Amino acid sequence: MNKLRTNYLISYLKKVVLFVVVLALTVCLTGCEEQDELVLRVYSWEDYIDDGTDDNGIKIGNSVMEDFEEWYFEKYGVKVIVEYDTFATNEVMMNTLKTGKTSYDLICPSDYTIQKMIGNSPEENMLEEFDYTLRDQNGDLIIDNYKYLSPYLRNLFEEKGWDKYSIPYMWGTLGLIYNPEVVDHEDAKHWNILWDEKYKNQATAKDSVRDTYVIGVMEVYYDELMELREKYLNNEISQKEYSAHVQEIMNRCDDPNDPTEPGGTLEKIERALKDMKNNLYGFEVDNGKSDIVTGKIAINFAWSGDAVYSLDTAEYDNEEEPVYLYYSVPEEGSNVWFDGWVMPKGANKKLAQSFVNYLCSPEMAVRNMSFIGYTSGIIGDEVLDMINEWYGVLPYYYEDEEDPESTGWYFDGEILDIDYSADAEPKIIPNSNGENLYDIYINDTLIEEEVECYEVSLNHYFENADQEILDSIKPRYLKDGKVTVYVWERDRQFDTQYPSMEVLARCAIMEDFGIQNNAVMDMWENVKIGDIPFSITILVLGLLTLCLGALYTKRFMKARQKAKRRKIIE
């Protein structure tokens, strides 16, 4: 009997051990499956990354997401699927997150929304921190390409403390696109052109309180801003002091120290924007960038990325009659804006940071800039090559694997009949016959003489950059040790994408309205609705009186009819 019990116990224990082993293997295999296939959920703006399609939406190659999936598998041996969703506004994105129905690893909001997501306390913070020291299993830094971020942009983020929670993706300015055949260049240097009756019904502004608020605050504090500009240009204040003053003015939402103006800043801006509205063709969300190309309007208040689109389209889509539009950041000042990558709480940090690192490579930055027309915060030799190919006068080498006859050195859009390898070095030398005249060489061969072009410093984007980046810059982009390019023209596409330090000094980040948000929104609704004329008020009251009178008469007649019927019945 004891033997039977012992055998039963041994059999039972074997089954238990087998069950535990199977369970452990199942868990391990499940874990391996999860490790072998990761999902990265990304939420960003529409048309804000190279999706592998042409201008007609036809698939012509891999998207950036597909290439990242391949790169990640080659590097780590793990399959990744990138699920890429898009939103139209920051507010739509925030509402989606609040529902809690969908979670994301990576989101690309605008600067003021990043500020909202960080919040004012740990309890309000919606974001994970980036770990710039995190390394992968190979010992490589996960966010190694952060070194390519322009120190200018990096400093702006670090000053706000945003660098812990966000890495810039694209950035730009707000300004005015204008047609010089209709608009005087001098007039376009100031925001008050939008109030100028000379251009009545020829300009549009954004149907966005945040963007159009910039115009209002710049107009209201015109004198103060121009005085600051004068001090900066006369070296009475530093660039940092100047930018700080502009920042403070741009973010004014009230003015309690001014007893002569009821309501302070908001009251002044409301009056100014109402006057401006009466002079505009109208407010728009996205049509303005096309309307200025077709000639429907002559001035469009725009983001710099949309400005590049408009300038390119007007110039190149109508070869018979090209229109050469310009872009201006008015002298009073403007907004410098950013869209940056953030990781919501609970994100797969390692995978999300790997994707951001991939996007921060100069190669990917150039690729995405080429696709969407906006400006990346990434710098490097590849970016300088792109700038020169798009806007510069120096010859560049182009290699076409599919068409060897198209491979070679190009100047001013034409292939050169010279037998130099890609290692040859272009040079530019001032010509003594006039200002802005230069002679162009490749090695010692003269390519063109007396070329009219402009020398432009880009050193403010590279100053204090990683030494590895500075050492990689080709000699053709350096003058006296400073990063310099030579471009065909000014105040058009090149300056739209890469403003000078003088322009950037008068641009500031617009912060969240905070506790004044409702007051600002009320002000904006008042601007859009406008003041109702007295004659309209009388007309509305008259119609209301007639309607009420008719309603009363109808009810009175019904009551009399009922009374008559009761008498008849009785």
Give, region by region, the residue ranges found by the protein language model.
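C-terminal motif of bacterial Sec signal peptides marking the signal peptidase cleavage site
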Residues: 27-31
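Alpha-helical transmembrane segments
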Residues: 544-558
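Extracytoplasmic/periplasmic substrate-binding proteins
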Residues: 278-346, 386, 390-397
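Juxtamembrane/start-of-transmembrane alpha-helix segments at the extracytoplasmic/lumenal side
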Residues: 527-544
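Early extracytoplasmic/lumenal segment of secretory-pathway proteins
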Residues: 34-120, 141
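Cytoplasmic C-terminal tails of single-pass
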Residues: 558-570
